[in-house]
A protein has these predicted regions:
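Non-Sec secretion/translocation targeting segments of pathogen effectors
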Residues: 1-65, 578
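Active-site-proximal helices and loops of the catalytic beta/alpha 8
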Residues: 66-67, 181, 185, 189, ...
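Active-site-adjacent "subsite" loops/lids of carbohydrate-active enzymes
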Residues: 201-260, 270-271
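Short, well-ordered beta-strand segments enriched in hydrophobic/aromatic residues
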Residues: 499-507
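C-terminal beta-sandwich/jelly-roll accessory domains of carbohydrate-active enzymes
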Residues: 507-578
Length: 578
């Protein structure tokens, strides 16, 4: 939720002065089946607890059940770079704005779990296999942002937002949510729920035992976010003793997720809790489901946090504590001044993987809900460029924000306007310009450029066809010449004699020409782009050991080339620790 995108800050906080700890053994085997125990004593205890906790009254049975042959494997997908993630906001995912004012009012229907089911076939057809669902909790109503409250200002972590429930359906809130999850699972779509890092002001008043306080007795608030209050993870920070009540709350959140069939958790601002907290909570989840996946919102190494009241960022610490995947820095792709800076970042991540347990990875965070729409960085061509890159980069699981598929720029007519109808104490329709609305009951995400979604589907299909090369193969940085402004990105992915060649123009405004060294490439190599054409055309010509290119603005091309021995003639070869 909170991040820095200043490239100078990033550069000043480079990892090169960090001494990494030895790689730790993973808590659980990622290929393990759901855990069973041979301990008769433990079985007796669990059976006894089940009898003690059995409800006194008969509970309504859910009308849907998880498919009998469904097994969670989200953690393995993360660790094998096989997740293709779509981020959604349930209250807007299938909202029906009929009068065109871009928010839901009158008798219009906002998004619910049940009407979200209507879009799942679309999600599957687009190529996604995982949903990242932004927080589903009731939002705080006091000191609120927007007329529906920020999704990251939860009033109750163990409850479900009434906005997400269809009042005409007789099932309970959790049964309706489970019906949605079951429909996802029928399509082999995994469900990852967002865990907010902070509390609403409402929760702060109700549960002071969970809250962090300043030395002057005031509530600790993250800089720039007046609607939320920070949790206190410590009972005694000097002794590194955790706050047992806050830890228990989060265990109950994990239990709720697993009981409902959720496959994993995305932790908002993971650094808001110390590694000791995650050292307990993540293994706790794996005791119940060894395949329960964990994604940390963490970006880059920081010597000190640039934000008041927020701990410094330490991605490696989060990964060692048990997180499977992190955000990383692809969201500042547009800020990297040249191709070399971008390539160096990729290599840093691959090098980092060897200081960690095997299989740690990143999401393709070229755009998240915290970032402005990629449409502002170069329109549809930029969207296609970043899609082609994240479809082929190593150590990465592609990640898309709902609305990207058709070029939503997340500009809302009602931005900051007064609305007499509100669910909170705020009548202002707060919006962060250019970002997906998380404060109001807004329209269904979407733009008017469906060709972006078509390109995305083709990129996913290409990734699936060459899955082993892309998820397991080496990453080869290719040398180039005559690229005066260093705008051409050129690399190969190689495995077992099969090679994919990727060339892209980072410049979104003009064509760029150069020569790329491709060892063992033949002059008669056919160059058939595995991705759809778009934008201004490119000119490419194969020569022996070299490729001449004049790439159109923001163009990306992927070719399968016949270079089974390319690794024998390259010295910039990198591989993820998997």
């Amino acid at each position: 939720m909170i991040n820095s995108t200043n490239l100078l800050t990033i550069k000043s906080n480079k990892i090169n002065h960090t001494t990494f700890l030895s790689a730790a053994t993973p808590v659980t085997n990622p290929q393990a089946k759901p855990k069973t125990t041979n301990s008769s004593l433990l079985n007796a205890y669990l059976n006894n607890m089940a009898m003690i906790n059995a409800p006194v009254v008969k509970v309504q049975k859910p009308e849907t059940t998880t498919p009998a042959n469904y097994h969670n494997n989200l953690r393995s997908l993360f660790r094998n770079n096989e997740a293709k993630i779509l981020m959604i906001v349930p209250r807007t995912f299938n909202a029906q704005d009929k009068n065109g004012n871009e928010y839901i009012d009158g008798n219009e229907i906002h998004g619910t779990f049940l009407n979200a089911i209507d879009r799942l076939d679309e999600v599957k057809a687009d190529g996604f296999n995982t949903l990242h669902i932004l927080p589903i909790n009731p939002t705080g109503k006091m000191k609120a942002m927007g007329t529906a409250g920020s999704l990251y200002s939860p009033k109750d972590l163990l409850a479900i937002d009434p906005n997400l429930i269809d009042p005409k359906d007789p099932r309970s809130d959790k049964d309706q949510f489970k019906a949605f999850i079951d429909e996802c699972h029928k399509r082999d779509i995994k469900v990852m729920i967002d865990l907010p890092s902070c509390a609403s002001y409402d929760m702060f008043l109700e549960h002071p035992e969970w809250m962090a306080m300043e030395s002057d007795g005031l509530a600790k608030t993250p800089q720039g976010w007046n609607d939320i209050r920070m949790f206190q993870p410590w009972k005694d920070e000097g002794k590194r003793t955790l706050n047992p009540k806050l830890l228990e709350l989060h265990k109950q959140f994990v239990d709720m997720c697993i009981d409902l069939g959720v496959d994993g958790i995305r932790s908002d601002v993971a650094r808001a809790k110390p590694v000791e907290f995650w050292d307990v909570l993540i293994p706790y989840s794996h005791m119940r489901d060894p395949e329960f996946g964990w994604l940390a919102e963490t970006y880059t190494y920081e010597d000190a946090s640039p934000q008041a009241n927020m701990p410094y960022d330490r991605p490696q610490d989060s990964l060692r504590a048990g997180f499977d995947m992190i955000y990383g820095q692809y969201h500042i792709f547009h800020e990297f001044p040249d191709a070399t800076s971008f390539m160096n970042y990729i290599k840093e991540q691959l090098d980092m993987s060897y200081s960690l347990p095997k299989g740690k990875s990143l999401i393709g965070s070229f755009a998240t809900h915290d970032d402005i729409s990629p449409m502002f960085h170069g329109g549809a061509d930029y969207c296609n460029l970043t899609m082609g890159l994240q479809a082929t980069l190593p150590m990465l699981n592609p990640y898309i924000v709902d609305g990207y598929q058709s070029g939503d720029n997340y500009s809302y007519k009602y931005e900051d306007s007064h609305n007499p109808v509100t669910q909170t104490d705020n009548n202002e329709m707060t919006v962060h310009r250019g970002r997906l609305d998380i404060f109001n009951l807004s329209r269904k995400p979407g733009g008017n450029q469906p060709e972006i979604g078509k390109f995305m589907k083709s990129a996913f299909a290409m990734r699936d066809k060459y899955k082993d090369v892309i998820t397991k193969g080496t990453f080869i940085q290719l040398d180039k010449s005559k690229d005066k402004n260093d705008q051409v990105i050129a690399y190969a992915r190689h495995l077992n004699g099969k090679t994919l060649l990727v060339v892209a123009n980072k410049n979104v405004n003009r064509s760029t020409a150069c020569k790329i060294k491709v060892p063992t490439l033949k002059a008669d190599q056919k160059l058939e782009n595995l991705l759809p054409s778009y934008g201004q055309p490119s000119i490419l010509q194969a020569h022996d050991n070299e490729l001449s290119v004049n790439l159109g603005p923001a163009r990306v091309h992927v070719f399968e080339i016949d270079t089974p021995n390319i690794e024998n003639y390259c010295n910039k070869i990198y591989r993820q620790n998997v």
